[in-house]
Regions:
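Histidine- and aromatic-rich ligand-binding microenvironments
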Residues: 5-6, 41-42, 97-101, 119-120, ...
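Amphipathic alpha-helical segments within well-ordered protein domains
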Residues: 50-54, 90
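Residues that scaffold the ATP/ADP-binding catalytic core of kinase and kinase-like folds
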Residues: 12-14, 52, 125
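Acidic, PIN/NYN-like endoribonuclease modules and their adjacent C-terminal/linker elements
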Residues: 105-132
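A generic structural signal for short hydrophobic patches within well-formed alpha-helices
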Residues: 10, 46, 122-123
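Short, well-structured N-terminal submotif of metal-dependent ribonuclease cores
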Residues: 1-41, 56-63
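Active-site neighborhoods of divalent-metal-dependent phosphate/nucleic-acid chemistry enzymes
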Residues: 76-114
Length: 132
Protein backbone atom coordinates (compact mmCIF):
# COMPACT_ATOMS: atom_id res chain seq x y z
CA UNK A 1 0.00 0.00 0.00
CA UNK A 2 1.10 3.59 -0.56
CA UNK A 3 0.64 6.18 2.18
CA UNK A 4 0.88 9.97 1.86
CA UNK A 5 2.99 11.62 4.53
CA UNK A 6 1.84 14.82 6.23
CA UNK A 7 4.27 17.65 6.95
CA UNK A 8 4.22 16.82 10.67
CA UNK A 9 5.52 13.30 9.97
CA UNK A 10 8.18 14.46 7.50
CA UNK A 11 9.43 17.03 10.01
CA UNK A 12 9.68 14.41 12.76
CA UNK A 13 11.66 12.12 10.46
CA UNK A 14 13.96 14.93 9.33
CA UNK A 15 14.56 16.68 12.66
CA UNK A 16 14.11 13.97 15.27
CA UNK A 17 12.07 16.48 17.29
CA UNK A 18 10.17 16.15 19.49
CA UNK A 19 11.89 12.91 20.34
CA UNK A 20 8.82 10.91 21.39
CA UNK A 21 6.86 11.66 18.20
CA UNK A 22 9.97 11.33 16.05
CA UNK A 23 10.58 7.85 17.45
CA UNK A 24 6.97 6.85 16.73
CA UNK A 25 7.15 8.30 13.20
CA UNK A 26 10.39 6.44 12.52
CA UNK A 27 8.94 3.20 13.88
CA UNK A 28 5.85 3.58 11.66
CA UNK A 29 8.05 4.26 8.62
CA UNK A 30 10.32 1.28 9.35
CA UNK A 31 7.35 -1.02 10.00
CA UNK A 32 5.83 0.11 6.71
CA UNK A 33 9.02 -0.54 4.77
CA UNK A 34 9.28 -4.00 6.35
CA UNK A 35 5.69 -4.68 5.24
CA UNK A 36 6.43 -3.54 1.68
CA UNK A 37 4.60 -0.21 1.93
CA UNK A 38 5.56 2.93 0.04
CA UNK A 39 5.35 6.53 1.21
CA UNK A 40 4.57 9.55 -0.94
CA UNK A 41 5.43 13.19 -0.22
CA UNK A 42 3.42 15.85 -2.07
CA UNK A 43 4.89 19.10 -3.37
CA UNK A 44 2.90 21.00 -0.74
CA UNK A 45 4.37 18.87 2.05
CA UNK A 46 7.87 19.32 0.57
CA UNK A 47 7.39 23.11 0.48
CA UNK A 48 5.94 23.27 4.00
CA UNK A 49 8.76 21.08 5.32
CA UNK A 50 11.39 23.26 3.64
CA UNK A 51 10.00 26.44 5.18
CA UNK A 52 9.47 24.84 8.61
CA UNK A 53 13.03 23.49 8.72
CA UNK A 54 14.34 26.93 7.85
CA UNK A 55 12.18 29.07 10.08
CA UNK A 56 11.32 26.86 13.05
CA UNK A 57 14.52 24.83 13.26
CA UNK A 58 16.95 27.59 12.21
CA UNK A 59 18.58 25.70 9.34
CA UNK A 60 20.11 27.32 6.26
CA UNK A 61 18.63 26.87 2.80
CA UNK A 62 21.44 24.47 1.99
CA UNK A 63 20.83 22.38 5.13
CA UNK A 64 17.05 22.25 4.61
CA UNK A 65 17.36 21.30 0.95
CA UNK A 66 20.07 18.75 1.74
CA UNK A 67 17.83 17.11 4.33
CA UNK A 68 14.93 16.91 1.87
CA UNK A 69 17.15 15.56 -0.89
CA UNK A 70 18.62 12.88 1.39
CA UNK A 71 15.15 11.95 2.61
CA UNK A 72 13.89 11.65 -0.97
CA UNK A 73 16.51 8.95 -1.60
CA UNK A 74 15.21 6.83 1.29
CA UNK A 75 13.69 3.39 0.88
CA UNK A 76 10.05 3.48 -0.16
CA UNK A 77 9.91 7.28 -0.37
CA UNK A 78 8.62 9.00 -3.50
CA UNK A 79 8.39 12.66 -4.38
CA UNK A 80 6.99 14.21 -7.56
CA UNK A 81 8.87 14.90 -10.77
CA UNK A 82 8.46 18.61 -9.94
CA UNK A 83 10.38 18.04 -6.72
CA UNK A 84 13.10 16.18 -8.62
CA UNK A 85 13.45 19.01 -11.15
CA UNK A 86 13.72 21.63 -8.41
CA UNK A 87 15.92 19.77 -5.91
CA UNK A 88 18.40 18.74 -8.61
CA UNK A 89 18.94 22.29 -9.89
CA UNK A 90 22.66 23.00 -9.48
CA UNK A 91 23.28 25.15 -6.40
CA UNK A 92 19.55 25.23 -5.68
CA UNK A 93 20.23 26.85 -2.30
CA UNK A 94 21.50 29.93 -4.20
CA UNK A 95 19.18 29.72 -7.21
CA UNK A 96 16.68 32.37 -8.19
CA UNK A 97 13.90 31.46 -8.61
CA UNK A 98 14.29 29.19 -5.65
CA UNK A 99 13.22 25.68 -4.75
CA UNK A 100 9.49 26.23 -4.16
CA UNK A 101 9.06 28.56 -7.15
CA UNK A 102 10.73 25.98 -9.39
CA UNK A 103 8.42 23.23 -8.12
CA UNK A 104 5.44 25.47 -8.81
CA UNK A 105 6.56 26.37 -12.35
CA UNK A 106 7.37 22.74 -13.09
CA UNK A 107 3.91 21.70 -11.89
CA UNK A 108 2.18 24.25 -14.13
CA UNK A 109 4.41 23.26 -17.05
CA UNK A 110 3.55 19.60 -16.52
CA UNK A 111 -0.11 20.60 -16.88
CA UNK A 112 0.65 22.50 -20.11
CA UNK A 113 0.14 25.86 -18.39
CA UNK A 114 2.23 29.02 -18.44
CA UNK A 115 3.28 30.44 -15.08
CA UNK A 116 2.46 34.13 -14.55
CA UNK A 117 4.53 35.91 -11.92
CA UNK A 118 5.49 39.41 -10.87
CA UNK A 119 8.96 38.14 -9.93
CA UNK A 120 11.54 38.99 -12.58
CA UNK A 121 13.57 35.89 -11.74
CA UNK A 122 10.86 33.75 -13.37
CA UNK A 123 12.20 34.92 -16.75
CA UNK A 124 14.94 32.33 -16.26
CA UNK A 125 12.39 29.51 -16.39
CA UNK A 126 10.63 28.12 -19.46
CA UNK A 127 6.96 28.80 -20.14
CA UNK A 128 6.62 31.84 -17.92
CA UNK A 129 5.18 35.31 -18.26
CA UNK A 130 6.42 38.10 -16.01
CA UNK A 131 4.27 41.10 -15.17
CA UNK A 132 6.54 44.05 -14.48
Amino acid sequence: MTFGLDTSVVLRLLTGQPQDLAAKALERYQDGIAAGDDFSVSDLVAAESYYAIRHHYGKTKEEALGALKSFSAGDGISFSQNFAVAINTPNIHKASPGFVDRMLASDYGERGQITISCEKSFRRLPDTEVIS
